[in-house]
Amino acid sequence: RLPQSIRTQEILLQNGTVQDCRGCSYEACRHFAEGGRCFYGGAVTEQVLPAVQQADAVLLLCPNYNDAVSANMTAFFNRLTNLAVVRELWDKYVWAVVVSGFSGSDLVARQVLGAMCLNKAAILPPRFCLLQTANDPGAAAEAENVGTKLDVFAKSIVDTLLP
């Protein structure tokens, strides 16, 4: 739904290889970050943080796990501190798609807002979050008016990034 003029890169956090931050001191975190790495290494240091640093925008796909983002998404939010201590993120746009079984989409959206905007200072544009209810696997893609919702959501991304 996004035009080819918007280059995308998909990074999966679902394979369980994302190690959460264990809370280095600010000085230690900054020391490693200045060298372009994190003490805990792995996919976050090698793929995720460099991709975020190069990106103009980040689109997060957030399934609702018991009214919360996934453990890997939480680890991403926490490990993003390693980039934020050496480079301001105030010029990065963030959008999210939240899919919930019955309820709690608003809680997940608030976690994205808190982690990415309030804590990391990224930009969350108006209507940054698309919320969808889906009770069964694959049901989100078949939901009523989902195509129209996605078109409107994609247009808002394009209008923001390519004014």
List where the protein language model places each region.
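N-terminal beta1-alpha1-beta2 submodule of the flavodoxin-like/Rossmannoid cofactor-binding fold
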Residues: 1-85, 138-163
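Short, highly charged low-complexity linear segments
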Residues: 117-121, 133-136, 157-162
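Short beta-alpha connecting loops at secondary-structure transitions
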Residues: 96, 135-138
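Short, glycine-/small-residue-rich phosphate/pyrophosphate-handling segment
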Residues: 89-131
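Short beta->alpha junction loops
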Residues: 13-15, 128-135
